[in-house]
Structure formats: C-alpha cells, structure tokens
A protein has these predicted regions:
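Short, intrinsically disordered, charge-balanced linker/junction segments flanking boundaries
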Residues: 154-165
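Zinc-coordinating Cys/His ligand positions in small cysteine/histidine-rich zinc-finger domains
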Residues: 135, 139
C-alpha cells in the first residue's frame, strides 16, 4: 500500500496477535506446529507491525472502491451497475502463531463479500447478512442479477435469496 495508508496505522495502536495457548509453549514446540515455521517471521516487533501493512492495504482498497463508485455516480451509470466484491482468503497475521492463509481459523476464512447496486436488484441498502457464503456462490449470484440462467451443473447458490431475507 502507498505510504500514506501505512502511516494511518501505528504499531502502538494495534493489538497483539491472538496466540491462545501457544504462548505457554516453548518456542521450538510452537514453531513445530506453526504453518510456515521455517519462513514465518520470528522477530516479535516485526510480527506486531505486520497488521499495519495489511490494514493499510485494505484501507487503500476501500478508498479505490470509493473512487470507482464516485465515478459511476458522476457518469450517471450507478443506477445500472452492480458491484460485487469478495476476497478469496484472509490473513492470520500471527494469530495462533500462524501467517498467511494456513488453517480454518477466523482470520483466514472470514472475508468480506458485498453486493452493491440499485435496490431493485440487490435489496435494501445497508442490509447485513451473516449467513455462510462461499466463493462458488459468486457466479450464480451474478448470473441471476444479469437475468441469465444458472446451469444445473453449478455447485453454488445465488445469494440474492439470502440477502432478500
């Protein structure tokens, strides 16, 4: 992320990674259970600063999405536009002494997914749904929004019914 966004987050303002019971183990025992134990950072101050870069990248992305929406509004085409944003994985950021997208812990599997557009397509603005959604649901959702048939061979399910509830 550009330096401007990195400077929004200071290491002092960030919480320590959640370790659970791992802090009670000796380092060699923790490392043997840690994903990427050979390549994961071991410097505690560096580990503490990792979230700043991650949060900076998210804030930068959020700003870019805002610019896109502003341009769509300015061009008067937002009323005919659907935006679906999703990430394929999260980041462990040192939680449970893990990094990247190693295991099915919350930091790795809980990712943003939002659908924005005219209410006639996506339902009431500001609706938050906490139901489980999967990446395989994205394609049938976009097909339904486009008015196209969803092939029977598709594993996913459109999220529109979920959002409409």
């Amino acid at each position: 992320a550009p330096e401007y966004y990195v400077n929004l987050y200071t290491a002092e303002s960030l919480a320590e990674p959640w370790r659970g019971d791992w802090n009670d183990c000796v380092r060699w025992e923790r490392d043997s259970h840690s994903y990427h134990a050979q390549t994961a950072p071991s410097d505690e101050s560096y580990i503490h600063q990792l979230p700043a870069g991650y949060y900076a990248a998210i804030t930068h992305m959020d700003h870019q999405i805002g610019r896109l929406v502003s341009a769509l509004v300015e061009e008067q085409i937002m009323d005919n536009t659907i935006i679906l944003f999703v990430s394929d994985h999260g980041e462990m950021l040192g939680d449970h002494l893990m990094f990247q997208k190693a295991k099915p812990f919350q930091g790795s599997i809980r990712v943003p997914l939002f659908i924005s557009g005219p209410e006639r397509y996506v339902g009431k603005h500001g609706t938050v749904c906490t139901d489980l959604a999967e990446l395989r649901d994205v394609m049938p959702t976009l097909l339904e929004l486009a008015g196209a048939p969803i092939p029977e061979t598709v594993d996913g399910t459109s999220l529109l019914l979920t959002v409409a509830r």
